[in-house]
Amino acid sequence: MSGSQKVEESRKVETDAPAQIIYRIDKNRYLTLENYISCDRGGQVYYNDSQRGIKTHLGWDNDFYDFSYRRGNNIAAYQGSIINGADNGYLAFPGASTRQYCGSGRSETGCPVFFFFSADHGNTFIYKIVAMEYSTPERFSQLKVVVANDGVYLRDESKTEDSYSRPTGLNDLSSVNKLRFSDGNLISVYDDWQKKIDELVKEELIRKKMPYANEYGPRFHIFDYLRTLTPPKTHEERNLMANELSEIQIRIEDEVYKDGIKFPKPSTSSIDVKYQCNKNIKAKTITYTNESNGKKEVVKNEQ
């Protein structure tokens, strides 16, 4: 590092902006944006449950420092819809990369969409990235998230869904995808489907007394198996066996996938379905505290 270069010192940020409710589930449960400069400049988002006496920060420790303020607020930046309709303690609050972070969509780090999920009424939350390919904040404005008692459902409604649409993985949101909670983790229904398909294919291979039935599994490759046979199979025989396995797999996949996933209709629904921040409310003064020496600098918000 040259002598002319300086390492920017971390400064903690405090503002006089009043807390504002940006999302409400019901009269007792809501999100607040606090300690912000403006709706798109920093601050911390908290989940509040006045009935249970819960207030939980949705974010990280570095959210309080000026570097994060320059990158906006990831929760408030989310422009899609969110319906919290579970009554068993499940909650989810999506967030998204801000324009300061994502820019024009050419960011090397991508523009992830994520959500915070709780299974204990908001006492604790886990963090889950659900998509990385979004190019700008506007790109995920059509994302729909619904929380029900059996998990979190989500879909990018800007994409066309047809009768053959099905999730091809956790990050595929072209059709309704679902995550269920188990042992502290969120598991994609796609993983469940693949496990079921593998089990049913193996059962069918055993029933048909295929020679490789007991070896079949998620990592099985028919041509790798065929290369081990002696005497070797002819080209036509290899293709015949591979096609037979493929037909079994496709038939069982169609059977497992046929009903697809639909958004549930929760018995209750949140009052709000989108985050709403009043852009007219801003901080008047901002206090920066230097972490190394405790020196404070108070400035007026000129925005």
Residue positions per predicted region:
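N-terminal, post-signal-peptide region of Sec/Tat-exported proteins
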Residues: L33-R70
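Blade-loop segments of beta-propeller domains
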Residues: K55-R99
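Short, conserved, GDST-rich strand-edge loop motifs in beta-rich repeat architectures
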Residues: A96-T109, D162-V176
